[in-house]
Amino acid sequence: MIEIPSEYRGWWRIAETSLWGESGLDVIGTALLSITGSDDRLRMHCLLAYVNWKVNTASLSFNWNGSWEFDEMSGTGNVKLRRDGRLDGRLAIKNGDKSTFVAEPAEPPEHSIPHPPSWRDKWGSRRW
């Protein structure tokens, strides 16, 4: 488990993104990012992902691995604490889109964020 600075530790509600806007942000549940250093997750739009953190001097960076709907994806990102207590973040999809986001402190979700589905979850039951 990585030691996350206390000012970052917890759950964050992703309130807006520069590329995808706010429409559909919560389509599969409240858009959230967990920063605990153990079993962290990201959920927004149709993205479910596992997150691995790295502590930097004035920010946190992360790698993520998951799926957008049933398409496996991965990427990188970073967050920096603002003076108003919110996070400024960046999210990049490997070989794809990049977006900034703003996140606000939040309570943990009532139900845990599900594991990202794989293409097998979509196509595994089909017989060709």
Indicate residue ranges for each PLM-predicted region.
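N-terminal glycine/threonine-rich, aromatic-flanked beta-hairpin/loop signature
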Residues: I2-I4, W11-I14, E22-S59
